[in-house]
Amino acid sequence: MKTSRLPIAIQQAVMRRLREKLAQANLKLGRNYPEPKLSYTQRGTSAGTAWLESYEIRLNPVLLLENSEAFIEEVVPHELAHLLVWKHFGRVAPHGKEWKWMMESVLGVPARRTHQFELQSVRRNTFPYRCKCQEHQLTVRRHNRVVRGEAVYRCVHCGEQLVAK
């Protein structure tokens, strides 16, 4: 999905939230961190990613459209926090104590590592595999690695190797 398909009102709400949280952080930290580049090019099941070196936030337009309010409230500050932590502390653990502090104390947002959005619309085809205790769904990439003999996957519960159905 291209940015042009994303309603302008949603793009404006994203920018408002980004600028609001950046201003809040700059005030609390006594800094003047620049506004990061923002794009709507994230694909797959990730809601967003923060690219440190290019100082860029990439957001998933499909998940943004389907979950606008929660996405803008949570994902935008989450990714901004990664960039601010990198600027403020340098390279540290992605969801470590510095990130948690930035989210909760500086940005005033609960520090959640993962989103809870419905993923049906962004999930690719999967392939059924079995073990002793249950059925698993492997992604196309993992399935192809099994077919090429490059990988073996095991069940996290019973430890048995997964076998295609």
Swiss-Prot record:
Entry's Gene Ontology molecular function annotations: zinc ion binding
Localization annotation: Cytoplasm
GO cellular component, one term: cytoplasm
UniProt-listed GO biological process terms: response to stress
Keywords: Cytoplasm, Metal-binding, Zinc
Binding site for Zn(2+): H78, H82
Span of domain SprT-like: 20-163
HAMAP family registered for this protein in UniProt: SprT
Family label: Belongs to the SprT family.
Name of the protein: Protein SprT
Chain's gene name: sprT
